[in-house]
Structure formats: C-alpha cells, structure tokens
Amino acid sequence: MNKTNIGIFLCLFFVTASYFYIFSNNEKVGSAELEEGQPIEIVLVPAQISEQGLLGKNIFEHKCQSCHGINAAGRYEIGPPLVHKIYEPSHHSDQSFYRAVALGVKAHHWPFGNMAAVEGLTQGDIKAIISYVRELQRENGIL
C-alpha cells in the first residue's frame, strides 16, 4: 500500500467511526429534555385557514392527532411531525398521503414503527387533511 492509499483508508475509517459514534445514540440532539408524547416540532399556525383546511383540521384532530400531534407537530416517541421538510410535496406528494391512509406505511424516515392504515376516511376527508397539513407547512416555510 502506498501513502495515498493509506491516507484514503485512514480518512474513510475516521469518517465511518465518527458517523457511528454520532448516530449510534437513538436519541436526537436536544431530545433529552423531551418526554414521551411531547411535541417534536414547534409549529406556527396560520392566522386564517381555508374552509377546506378547517374541515381537514377537524378530521385530523379525530383521526391523526393521537400519533402526529397537535397541529401535526409530532409526538416524541409516538409519531412523526408532518410539518417537517421530509413531508414537503417534492418528497411526499399528496398521493403519498392517500396511500398512507389506505395502505399504511412501513417505517422509513423515523424510528416510530410502521403506520397502520386508517379506516373510516373518504377521499374527500383525506383531501381536507392534506389541505390542512399543507397550510401548516406553508406557514412554517416548508412549501
């Protein structure tokens, strides 16, 4: 092995070791003071919400809030925030919300486990929920 290869190997080793050291702890930075169920994000609520958004808020509060938190802020150790860059339309389109409700979701971004399908919602209900979530996202600079 020449000096260049040894240098590359050592750099890769230290980067990999640092990654595992930093991310091996399951707790997020700043989460030590959170207790189970507390909001994960601070969510600003728009001064005015559309009629469709208000309908969605009402449905969200009955069907989604127990996991996703008040105003979709998430609940520590329970469910993810939907007012988060991960859920912007370029990464999670409106269609992904329809699919999540109908089929459930295998955990892939967060450590909360899988989401079960949600029963008893019409396509119109889901559309209203999406409207509410997108309005919250817009107010929080995500859209």
Where are these regions (language model features)?
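Positively charged n-region of N-terminal signal peptides that target proteins for export
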Residues: 1-4
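Hydrophobic membrane-insertion alpha-helices, especially the h-region
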Residues: 7-21
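Electrostatic cytochrome c docking/interface patches
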Residues: 29-59
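Stable alpha-helical elements in mature extracytoplasmic
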Residues: 52, 93, 97, 125-126
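Gly/Gly-Pro-rich "capping" loops immediately C-terminal to redox-active cysteine motifs
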Residues: 57, 69-100, 117-120
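Axial heme c-ligation environment in periplasmic c-type cytochrome domains
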Residues: 76-83, 103-136, 141-143
